[in-house]
């Protein structure tokens, strides 16, 4: 059985950035957060959302600068510290204290920074 994917969610974070995300599964189940690479967007995780949404609240955001998320024009708005902050704030926005974080490529750099800087937010890093 595959979970239904719900697109078109938006999270306005405390830092002012608005992120688009897709999700599958039910809130309340463990959060499985997928971070895409460059130059991708949430759809890179389509199959994983369908599969893992049966057991988790699976979420795949469009990272800052990609697809339907905010696309700041200043290069300085893409510093690793700010990209990491987006992930940290998204976890809280979704109502979770931690998550299983799955990432690759560009998203992997942010995932590592979250795990190192805020280890209490990451139950597992994949």
Which residues does each predicted region cover?
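Conserved hydrolase catalytic core segment
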Residues: 97-126
């Amino acid at each position: 059985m595959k979970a239904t994917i719900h697109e078109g969610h938006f999270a306005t974070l405390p830092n002012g950035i608005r992120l688009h995300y897709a999700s599958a599964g039910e809130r309340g189940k463990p959060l499985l957060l997928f971070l895409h690479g460059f130059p991708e967007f949430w759809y890179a995780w389509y199959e994983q959302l369908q599969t893992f949404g049966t057991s988790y609240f699976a979420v795949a955001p469009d990272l800052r600068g990609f697809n339907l998320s905010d696309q700041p024009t200043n290069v300085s708005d893409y510093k690793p510290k700010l990209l990491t902050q987006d992930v940290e704030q998204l976890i809280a926005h979704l109502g979770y204290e931690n998550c299983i974080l799955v990432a690759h490529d560009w998203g992997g750099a942010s995932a590592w920074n979250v795990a190192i800087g805020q280890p209490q937010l990451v139950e597992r890093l994949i």
